[in-house]
Regions:
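Left-handed beta-helix
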Residues: 2-3, 206-362
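A short acidic, often aromatic-flanked loop/helix-cap motif at beta-alpha or helix-coil junctions
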Residues: 85-90, 149-151, 183-185, 273-274
Length: 362
C-alpha cells in the first residue's frame, strides 16, 4: 500500500466570525464548536488514518505561531507558512511538492481545517475508502456531502454511474463540478438526487495530481516546477517560497483541475458534516435556553428570543427585549448584527481595511 499523508489547509481568515476571528487568530484557531481549536480537532480526527509525522498544515506567516500552538504534537517542519495566499490550486501544488519530497509515489488528502464532524469513526472509515479509491486507479477523488437543502453557498458535484463499491461504500463517477448556483438552480439540483455539496475534501496520488496540473494548469505547473527547483537549490522551503510562491497563478483547485478533469470520482459522505460558515450556524451545535437563545461565555437574555450571545474573558454581556440577533463581545471589538444580515460582516471588514485608524481591528 502506498504511503499516505494528510495536508490540512489552515490559511483562511474566517471573516464571518469577526470579531473573534482576526488576522492572527482566524476561525480555525478558535473553539467555535467544541473545547479545542477547530484545527486541533481536524488534526486529531486524521490521527487514526495516517501517522502523526505524515500530517502537514499549510497556513500563513501571521498564523504560523498560532497553528504551532494548536498542533503541539506535529513536527514543527510539518507546519508550513505560505508567504501570501494564492488560492487552493497553489496550496494543492505546494502540498504536492511537500509530499513528493517525502515519497514521490505517496497518496495524500487535502482537507479544510475548520469543519465540524462529530462521527469521527465513520469519518475515518470514509476517508480510508477515499484513499483506497485513489490507489485503485489513476483517479482524482473527492468526498461529497448530501445536501440538507438548496444552499446557494456551496459548489455542487453531479454524480454519474457507479464506479465500484469499496468496503460497503458506493464510489460514483463524477459528471461535473458546478459553481455556487442561484436558489432556483439549487432547488433543481436537489430534485434530481444526483448532486452533492462540494466540501473541498480531496484525495489523490502524487503522480496523478501532478499529471493533472501538467495537463490542465500549465502556467501553474511551470511555477511549481520553479518552486521545486528553488527549494532544492537553496536546501529549504523558506527562501524558495518567498521568491516564487507570490508569482503563482491565483486560482481555485476546482477551476484549475477538477472542472477540467474526466478521471474524477466522488465518495458520498456517510458522516455528519457542517462547515459552520457564519455565526448563525453555531446555533444547531448548542442547547438553547427555553426561549431559543444560545449563550456562550458570561451572557444573558431578558425578554428576547432566538438570539446568539457570545462573550469573552468573563465580561457579562446582557441583551433585553430583542430577538434574532447575534451579539459577540471581545476585549477589542463588539458586534451586534441581525441574523439575516450576518453575511454583511465581510462588507464591514472591507470598510475597516480602508480606514487607517480602524485597520487594527481586523
Amino acid at each position: 500500500m502506498p504511503e499516505r499523508f494528510v495536508v490540512i489547509m489552515a490559511g483562511g481568515r474566517g471573516e464571518r466570525f469577526w470579531p473573534q476571528s482576526r488576522l492572527a487568530t482566524p476561525k480555525h484557531l478558535l473553539s467555535i464548536v467544541g473545547d479545542q481549536p477547530m484545527l486541533t480537532q481536524t488534526v486529531d480526527r486524521v490521527m487514526g488514518v495516517v501517522p502523526r509525522d505524515n500530517i502537514f498544515v499549510l497556513t500563513t506567516q501571521a498564523q504560523l505561531e498560532g497553528c504551532r500552538r494548536a498542533c503541539p504534537n506535529l513536527p514543527a517542519a510539518n507546519i508550513v507558512a505560505e508567504p501570501m495566499g494564492r488560492d487552493t490550486a497553489a496550496a494543492t501544488g505546494l502540498a504536492l511538492l511537500l509530499v513528493k519530497q517525502r515519497n514521490p509515489e505517496a497518496t495524500f488528502a487535502m482537507l479544510p481545517a475548520d469543519h465540524v464532524i462529530h462521527d469521527v469513526v465513520e469519518y475515518q472509515k470514509l476517508l480510508k475508502v477515499a484513499f483506497d479509491s485513489a490507489e485503485a486507479a489513476d483517479l482524482l477523488v473527492t468526498i461529497g456531502v448530501k445536501p440538507l437543502g438548496p444552499d446557494t453557498g456551496f459548489g455542487y458535484i453531479q454524480q454519474g454511474g457507479l464506479w465500484r463499491e469499496l468496503s460497503g461504500h458506493r464510489v460514483m463517477a463524477v459528471k461535473r463540478f458546478v459553481e455556487k448556483p442561484d436558489l432556483a438552480t439549487a432547488k433543481g439540483y436537489l430534485a434530481t438526487g444526483e448532486y452533492f455539496w462540494n466540501a473541498g475534501m480531496f484525495v489523490w496520488r502524487v503522480p496523478v495530481v501532478e499529471a493533472a496540473f501538467k495537463a490542465h494548469a500549465a502556467e501553474l505547473y511551470a511555477g511549481l516546477a520553479q518552486l521545486e527547483a528553488a527549494a532544492k537549490s537553496t536546501g529549504g522551503w523558506a527562501v524558495a517560497l518567498a521568491a516564487v510562491y507570490p508569482t503563482l497563478k491565483k486560482i481555485s483547485v476546482d477551476y484549475a483541475l477538477m472542472e477540467k478533469s474526466i478521471n474524477v470520482v466522488v465518495v458520498p459522505a456517510s458522516f455528519d458534516w457542517d462547515d459552520v460558515g457564519a455565526w448563525p450556524a453555531i446555533a444547531k451545535h448548542f442547547t438553547p435556553d427555553e426561549s431559543g437563545n444560545v449563550l456562550r461565555g458570561t451572557a444573558m437574555v431578558e425578554a428576547g428570543r432566538d438570539n446568539i450571545v457570545v462573550s469573552a474573558d468573563g465580561h457579562l454581556t446582557a441583551v433585553i427585549g430583542v430577538s434574532d440577533l447575534v451579539v459577540v463581545h471581545t476585549p477589542e471589538a463588539t458586534l451586534v448584527v441581525h441574523k439575516d444580515k450576518a453575511q454583511e460582516i465581510k462588507a464591514l471588514l472591507k470598510r475597516l481595511a480602508d480606514d487607517a485608524a480602524l485597520k487594527k481591528f481586523l
